[in-house]
Curated annotation (Swiss-Prot):
Protein name listed in UniProt: Putative ankyrin repeat protein RC0701
Species: Rickettsia conorii (strain ATCC VR-613 / Malish 7)
PROSITE patterns on file: ANK_REP_REGION, ANK_REPEAT
Spans of repeat ANK: 17-46
Highest taxon in the source lineage: Bacteria
Keywords: ANK repeat
Transmembrane residue ranges: none
Length: 54
């Protein structure tokens, strides 16, 4: 059982899809960056070329 006493994400915990809390956090931030670039008329493809998606 996981106790709710952690002050930072438990990197050893995985959800059903195999993602850790840090994976969710980085995915969320990447989405927000892309949304902001689109709003500002930025080039989204340049962002994706810098990120390595496996």
């Amino acid at each position: 059982m996981h106790k709710n006493t952690h002050t930072k994400p438990d990197v050893n915990f995985y959800d059903k899809s195999g993602k850790t809390p840090l994976d969710w956090y980085s995915d969320y931030n990447a989405t927000k960056i892309v949304e902001t670039l689109i709003k500002n008329g930025g080039n989204v493809s340049s962002v994706y070329s810098r990120c390595s998606y496996s």
